[in-house]
Amino acid sequence: MTLTRPLALISALAALILALPADAERIKDLTTIQGVRSNQLIGYGLVVGLDGTGDQTTQTPFTVQSIVSMMQQMGINLPSGTNLQLRNVAAVMVTGNLPPFAQPGQPMDVTVSSMGNARSLRGGTLLMTPLKGADNQVYAMAQGNLVIGGAGAGASGTSTQINHLGAGRISAGAIVERAVPSQLTETSTIRLELKEADFSTASMVVDAINKRFGNGTATPLDGRVIQVQPPMDINRIAFIGNLENLDVKPSQGPAKVILNARTGSVVMNQAVTLDDCAISHGNLSVVINTAPAISQPGPFSGGQTVATQVSQVEINKEPGQVIKLDKGTSLADVVKALNAIGATPQDLVAILQAMKAAGSLRADLEII
């Protein structure tokens, strides 16, 4: 793969975004219901049955302490001063998300991660582990055989490893023991929260709800929260189901450019135009001139006068040149020009950062 391949993909994606129309979306895809959320759970446990790849107990005293405590609870007392040398046990942290409306007896997935110096959790079995919430209450119990996505092997001082061996998952490995109370059907109102705050989209959602269920049903509180007053003579759950399936055409959000500083990935959500600026970046030279063009129809033809923008792009690769960008130039043109001369994604990242600092980039710049 050449270095210009990522920028070519960026150019194609930018053109595709501009060509796609803004279609209507369901309210359930644009909003969440306040109070309907998952809850994070965490627990400490032991994984046994490892093939000599567990914790080195001399370096992880908490593993030995956990084993001794577990055996004492089972009625097995070890002699004082016993030095356990175990290689098939590993101390782990178990995490999971308790889904909304989960009831006792329902299964949930959990992730098991080594917290000691175990070389691999492959082939291990998680012993019964209580999972607690932020309130220190037990909401689920986890136990089961781990599934590890990686693989590793070694001999004569040489080893190789594919993917990560220190963490794995147990599908349906936890059983819910306690439900989180929900007040969704008890409150007099329902609050919808837009996933992306936008006053125009909030207004459109309110209009769609009021048009379907009557004026006064929905009221915007701000650019994100919408308060809904369900009718008293219908089932609350059926009302929410019908409400979530209403179609709304969201407004176009603000222009945004996302940069990944580690990989050089650049993503644009729409057309981005630039103000006048000049940038010198290494040996890159890009000059883009944009001029208005008027399309005048013939006399009595019934056509309309249309104003368009004509861009002329000149590309050079000479040391110490200046990148000149006139007002109205699109970011897509800049990407295409840089792609044509073999610039790397890191070059594009540096140039966009300079444009934003100079105030010529008409978009929110986010670096991840």
From Swiss-Prot:
A biological process from GO: bacterial-type flagellum-dependent cell motility
Name used for this protein in its record: Flagellar P-ring protein
GO cellular component, one term: bacterial-type flagellum basal body, distal rod, P ring
Subunit details: The basal body constitutes a major portion of the flagellar organelle and consists of four rings (L,P,S, and M) mounted on a central rod.
Keywords: Bacterial flagellum, Periplasm, Signal
Primary location recorded for the protein, binned into one broad class: periplasm
UniProt keyword Signal, yes or no: yes
Function according to Swiss-Prot or TrEMBL: Assembles around the rod to form the L-ring and probably protects the motor/basal body from shearing forces during rotation.
NCBIfam families for the chain: PRK05303.1
Origin species: Methylobacillus flagellatus (strain ATCC 51484 / DSM 6875 / VKM B-1610 / KT)
Family to which this protein belongs: Belongs to the FlgI family.
Xref: InterPro entries: Flag_FlgI (IPR001782)
Stretch forming the signal peptide: 1-24
Pfam families hit by this protein: FlgI
Keyword Signal attached: yes
One annotated GO molecular function: structural molecule activity
